[in-house]
Amino acid sequence: MRPRLWLLLAAQLTVLHGNSVLQQTPAYIKVQTNKMVMLSCEAKISLSNMCIYWLRQRQAPSSDSHHEFLTLWDSAKGTIHGEEVEQEKIAVFRDASRFILNLTSVKPEDSGIYFCMIVGSPELTFGKGTQLSVVDFLPTTAQPTKKSTLKKRVCRLPRPETQKGPLCSPVTLGLLVAGVLVLLVSLGVAMHLCCRRRRARLRFMKQFYK
């Protein structure tokens, strides 16, 4: 029986959505057109004959929504794709307990909710789903505004002003000149007295030797 027909029959059975047995990551992803996407589904139970289905729901979950079969990974038969699936754009592989759905060159029409599923007896167990949004342009993130740093003011000591004009006042100059004159007069008086004393001594010596 074809997987698509089998799924239509299995959909009439009890369905368990969002079970913790299958953990899907990420919960939401937005990518740009023609990029690659990897969706992960980790099984928390050990099955002897592991078989993981990947389904897509193009519209929001409702009573009228249906699941589109994409591909399955069977431990015995390998990978089986759906009838209307572009096989060159989709691949599924196993990494330990994780099952990876790899989508390449995605388009906006590939947007939807992707579910992984395992078949029990009689119920179907779904993961919580990964919502994929494919857009032509990703929103640009605003650059964080830089905080304006206040510059610290450096307190500078005032420079001593250079004094223009004469360094000394007229009074000071007058005192200096008067001091110089007094010194000159004193020196002259001292020299005069010294000369007189010398002459007096010479006279005394002459009178003594006569």
UniProtKB/Swiss-Prot annotation:
- Residue spans, topological domain Cytoplasmic: 192-210
**Keyword Disulfide bond included in the entry's annotation:** yes
Q: Where does it reside? A: Cell membrane
Q: Write down the membrane topology.
A: Single-pass type I membrane protein
Q: Report the residue ranges that make up the Ig-like V-type domain in this protein.
A: 19-132
Presence of the UniProt keyword Hydrolase in the record: no
Leader sequence segment? 1-18
**GO terms of biological process kind:** adaptive immune response; regulation of immune response
Quote the SUPFAM superfamilies the UniProt record gives: Immunoglobulin
Q: Which residues cross the membrane?
A: 171-191
SS bonds (residue pairs): 41-116
GO cellular component terms attached to this protein's record: cell surface; plasma membrane
The UniProt keyword set, sorted, is: Adaptive immunity, Cell membrane, Disulfide bond, Glycoprotein, Immunity, Immunoglobulin domain, Membrane, Signal, Transmembrane, Transmembrane helix
Q: Cross-referenced SMART domains, in alphabetical order?
A: IG (SM00409)
- InterPro entries the UniProt entry points to: CD8B, Ig-like_dom, Ig-like_dom_sf, Ig-like_fold, Ig_sub, Ig_V-set
Molecular function as annotated in GO: coreceptor activity; MHC class I protein binding
Chain ranges sitting on the Extracellular side read 19-170
| CDD domains, per the entry | IgV_CD8_beta
The glycosylation sites annotated in the UniProt record are 102
Subunit architecture = In general heterodimer of an alpha and a beta chain linked by two disulfide bonds.
Its biological function? Identifies cytotoxic/suppressor T-cells that interact with MHC class I bearing targets. CD8 is thought to play a role in the process of T-cell mediated killing.
- What protein is this chain from? T-cell surface glycoprotein CD8 beta-2 chain
Which species does this protein come from? Homo sapiens (Human)
In the record, what lineage is assigned to the organism producing the protein? Eukaryota, Metazoa, Chordata, Craniata, Vertebrata
What gene name is given for the protein in this entry? CD8B2
